């Protein structure tokens, strides 16, 4: 290794997508003197961050998990969504031994099968196609009592997409003569990932005890009533569906079988722990039925549960290669994106590499981040600048979460503020890097804040809260002259960093360095 311009800082600005559209573009509307200066001064390009270029189905928008996996792996990582879709298509899904055993357990016990997960076509955490494949699998195996616990989205799809989706799904189940929605909860409650256990508790109680915040005679009514309270899909309070006598139609009992069909781990962990961890103490479980619990993918290596689609091992990720070279690394982010710069960036491996330090800055405890668009960016920046000055690290991986997390609110003014906060922080961080003679790459993992509105029927304007499939910026902050970057995809970033540092790219990395040969 002949790299002397240390540290090298990889700055991932979550949700910093590129779009020429002006209307509803918080990035265009914001005052960003620092990012503008970097784009004018240093080599930069656009990277594909969605669809087949990141291992997703064609046209599927990217997300933080997928983005960090591809960036850290230096190759296109075929995602769980793609794998599961493939198995449904070729029939292997219906032979999956873990899923088959779960269904056999329900048959043997004469008990109910509960399917819980994000009720969404978004394809980020789950997909309706997978839920329906499970229903059809169970029906074909003779299961008649199937209850669905629907977690409503409103972030990776339109804020109120669930109502029409639910109407369609109820008709689908009626046609099959099997499958009933037992509970409805916004993902804000059922899929919290920031240790706000009171939210998880509300969802857990609805699912296990039939103890809801609200009760409704049907799932379509439950959603409509939530809208009447001013709640979008994401925030609909846990609602239990009851029969004509007011009794929960799908309360969970001993020996029932549960399949959690989310394939993305980070927002599935807390609720799973509440179900399967005997030592659980984050809230009092008033009911804890012993069930046969199956996870669609591996949510956490500490969870001892059957996994339908185990992780595929990724060898020689960027962090692993740097570790073998004796390079000291720092990973730093606030809570919302900490798992992304550690677990996901390392190829879905929780264990730290040798020589890798981690720094977690707590995210603010607010209901939604539009209430505090700066989140903890300034605290992250202050800590990072101090660590840059220490001279201890060779490579630093940073995530600033604001443009993504505030972008999900759909509130334009808050998103503009988030962009401006990030710009301010980037300016301070790049100044600190230059002062010690380091270099940096400033990029994103997927788009979000560049699209805050959409138009229905070409006329009706509404908030847009999902990610986008737009390309993302990539800037190489260097004093080297005559450097040019070519267009590429996220998986080209790790090979580029290795080339900059004079380290040979391992054969597993199929990405191509972005630096043009001059």
UniProtKB/Swiss-Prot annotation:
Give the residues the record marks as binding substrate: 125, 155-156, 187, 193, 264-267, 337
Organism encoding this protein: Methanococcoides burtonii (strain DSM 6242 / NBRC 107633 / OCM 468 / ACE-M)
Family matches, as InterPro entries = Alkaline_phosphatase_core_sf (IPR017850), BPG-indep_PGM_N (IPR011258), Metalloenzyme (IPR006124), PGAM_B_sf (IPR036646), Pgm_bpd_ind (IPR005995)
Q: Would you kindly state one Gene Ontology biological process term found in this protein's UniProt entry?
A: glycolytic process
Alphabetical GO CC annotations of the entry are: cytoplasm
Name this polypeptide is given: 2,3-bisphosphoglycerate-independent phosphoglycerate mutase
Instruction: Return the similarity comment.
Output: Belongs to the BPG-independent phosphoglycerate mutase family.
* Top-rank taxon: Archaea
User: Quick one: which gene encodes this?
Assistant: gpmI
